[in-house]
């Protein structure tokens, strides 16, 4: 039986809103740490100079980094209105699965 120390870190997919209202999608094992990096300009180059930033959505991914990367790729392919529906809670990932096929 695995102890807590032996369990793999959960992965998360998240969306950050930039000052220009654009949505940035990324993955991490620690959302608050990664968002703090983005705010300090030490995160993704795509977000540098785009502040103030707001963390608007995150979702834990149970199946590890590979699954998180695949979901990130799929979310990046969504339209702005579909991403906004996720943020507003008007759509869930499983509802958007049809789009991914």
Curated annotation (Swiss-Prot):
Pfam families: GIY-YIG. PROSITE patterns: GIY_YIG (PS50164). Gene3D superfamilies: GIY-YIG endonuclease. SUPFAM superfamilies: GIY-YIG endonuclease (SSF82771). CDD domains: GIY-YIG_UPF0213 (cd10456). This is UPF0213 protein VC0395_0675/VC395_A0575. Residues 9-85 form the GIY-YIG domain. Belongs to the UPF0213 family. It comes from the Bacteria.
